[in-house]
Amino acid sequence: MRNLPKILTLLIVLVFISCIKPVKIIIPENMQNIPAMPVVGTENSWRLDFGGFHAYNIKDSDSRILLTDARNASYDIKSFEFMMSTAGGTQYECYCEFPMKSIDDETFRCMFQNVYNKFDVGKLTDRKLSSSSGEITIEGYFEFEGKKSDSKNVLVGYMYKDSDKLIGLVDVSNTNNETVWIDPSLDLHKQIMVAASSTSLILKHRKWYEGFYERLDQETEDTY
């Protein structure tokens, strides 16, 4: 019986999660004329597609090469990789790592390497996306329909800004039902960088929740 409080807490968490209604984000005004690109690909799929962008060979990795600082040493580090291609045939090898902290923790590292050009490398460092196209800032997005003015901020997406101009948005409010917006007036290389980063953030959220449920299952088993 000493484990009863822990079991009850886990049950309450599971009931709460199961009762959460799907969230519908509010599209920023200057994104409303940009075509929405729904993400096609289920939770455990090895492939994701949206618009003319395709992520495939998605798989977990055991490596730890991007997050080596001591402040993350006590956390379980999740790493994954995938290939990104476009309708034009450009291909990038993509690799990411993040610590299993809170879902809205900003610590995130990715590299996007052009298969055909070793000098074409994109780097995602927390909320900064750097490449030969320049630096893009990523900000958390918290606006959704029905949000109460006094409620705590809930992360529902990410905005991409180039010199304070909004150029992209990724909706991660509903796992396995994500959507991406990328300004089509951007040069192709910058679009690819935003697409690769968006794919990485989508996979991060999916894998965080996957790890979260695995921990719940393990803790439930340990109480018996």
Label each residue range with its predicted role.
Residues 3-10:
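Sec-dependent signal peptide recognition
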